[in-house]
């Protein structure tokens, strides 16, 4: 054996070298340094010294600590590494004082032997006879006590030291249950070592045995209490689930009555609960120490060898698992784990290693009962995300995404859906969807309306909208009434804005709204009809009923507004008022003298004929309507038109419909709000207040309001700001949701069609109605091949930011009655941005139309240039067939394509390979001359064939 020094020996013994030197000196081994060599004799002397010094009491205590690692999955499924430390302690004691000298070597030999057998005892499960031979159990009679019947230990109370002891395990209960269950008493085991008195045996002291028995009794009582608590909880859960199921069945039977034969048995749903609750009944009286365990009945089937109420000793260790056995029957070796989510301890993340054994979940909370799907009533707001919609329906978001994918929409979990799409998804998944009434600040407006004290209603002036086809004389008629000259100053002689005026007549005041007649201004006419009391329909006597005339009639009828027809231009030659009446009757506008309820007035705006008669008819109609409105109340009205003025900011034309608007009032109009800083009448004069039916221009709003928005005065500016911000956010969400839906709907179509050429535009106009009309008209020009893409449209002058946007996107800027400032012009020149100015909507539409026409791909046409007849064929080897032809019509060109026609049927269409006249190549051969023609890739020519020459030319297209 190789010698080692003191330091190496101390490292092997895991102790300090200085401490080992002291022990060597005490044993009489003279070593002065840790580097001194140690012989085998020195080690024997040290061992003898230690035996003599420590065995005087007749007892040897062995301690052992093992550390290992276990990998297990936690509740979330992630793998964890758990440190497991096992501590063991063994006390060996000599039985008699006389045997002490002889027993010392035996104890020294048995101690390492016992330690070596301990790790082997855990994986082994001997199925031999219960009584072991004394020669194989050194010190086991004192350590091994009788095994009491125990329930399955709780995970928190597990004792690793006791679980690691070698234990005999009885065979499965089959033929001889009494023998398999019985266990020898300690008295019987104590007599066996006496048969071999020559061999010393170590036993535990009586105090140690008594303390261990007391500890086991305490643990058994504790486990019994825990079993009772668990059993009570399971029974309570079973009763609750049975009651819940019974209530559901009653509700289902009340909703859908079924025949008695189809009803399920009452006891069927409770069967799983009974199996759980009866799994651990109260154990019977425990057998006395050393007594045999009670055996099951001999006639019990194999499956009943471990009944649900068999107590805890069935779960303590059997040599083998019975068929389909539970994890409770795995020999008691399973280490308790953390009980989570009502599952078995073995499935927790602190559970012991599985070693390939089947895992069975504790079915404590796995109650499954037949139930019909629950239908939810889902309240859907204007916009909602996919995640929120899934939460409202109590389904996974993946189900909603799957349903949307079936509808052709690719969405994410945070995608915003509009209300219409969300309602379709809710119905698709079998729930009931309803549009939600949003809990928004606008409810404050309804409450405020309810708190208003009834004000005195007074007579108000009628609001009259003048409508009709373009160039039928609407503005000229208003000029004659107002004694003004508005029409003369309008660009192109047509009205492109909605105007509001009020006129004082001897019989009262009348407010007029002048609407454009051009087809592009449909939205303006609709707003005019919405805000009006009476519609004056102007029809030119020499022109008749036109498309915009019919549209105006539809607007008036949709708004439920009476119509007064003014037949204009009766002084012109060719005027035919009777024809006008007949055409209007076809549109369900019947004159009074024909038995209808519509007044017809023949006027001439140019000559001023019968203007008073028109005013009389308007006031007469107003008297019939009995128009009233409160005066001493907060003002309410409608935004007729709005624009952005460079010096004054946002300017809105407001028609007051009820109440009185005063300077300084807080006004809310759509997403704009603010205090009224100034009020101007139609002549530009400042006024302090405006009553019902008075049109005014107001300054001071935070933003340009939308034309057609309702406006109202609020008492609290803070509340007005809150409502405006809420509306702006809601409008933005709805717009983004609709844009996203449109993108998704058109995605596959765009992929199939390929890239569509687009003309990007930026539109800036003087008023909001103008850019709405212009943008709508230009977008109507789009086709499948080219389209108008409006990047931005707004009110006001052309700014530097507009030019930068146009430069980044290669867009054209259209200024309608606006101009670019100096900075914008410089930036436009530097970046080469094209800015076009227009003041007539016709010109803008025509130029954009021509630009789109230039973007269209040209159309290809065939043009026949000549015809030749084959007179003779020449076959040349390695060259092919050459046709001797006579040009009988037109001209044959070298670049032409050739069609071979035989008996009036085209047999070949291809290219010309060579064209010769005599031996020379020529570019063309005219009518009346012969030539030689060879076709590329075609030699099956016959005499008499017709050769038709044609060219493909490109023709420019237009919209």
From Swiss-Prot:
Residues 55-201, 233-370 are annotated as: Disordered. Belongs to the TRAFAC class translation factor GTPase superfamily. Classic translation factor GTPase family. IF-2 subfamily. This is Translation initiation factor IF-2. It is found in: Cytoplasm. Residues 604-606 are annotated as: G5. SUPFAM superfamilies: Initiation factor IF2/eIF5b, domain 3, P-loop containing nucleoside triphosphate hydrolases, Putative DNA-binding domain, Translation proteins. It comes from the Bacteria. Residues 98-114, 122-131, 178-201, 243-259, 275-311 have a biased composition (Low complexity). InterPro entries: DNA-bd_dom_put_sf, EF-G-like_DII, IF2_assoc_dom_bac, IF2_II, IF2_N, P-loop_NTPase, Small_GTP-bd, T_Tr_GTP-bd_dom. It comes from Laribacter hongkongensis (strain HLHK9). Keywords: Cytoplasm, GTP-binding, Initiation factor, Nucleotide-binding, Protein biosynthesis. Residues 459-628 form the tr-type G domain. GO terms for molecular function: GTP binding; GTPase activity; translation initiation factor activity. GTP binds at residues 468-475, 514-518, 568-571. Residues 514-517 are annotated as: G3. GO terms for cellular component: cytosol. The gene is infB. The lineage of its organism: Bacteria, Pseudomonadati, Pseudomonadota, Betaproteobacteria, Neisseriales. Residues 493-497 are annotated as: G2.
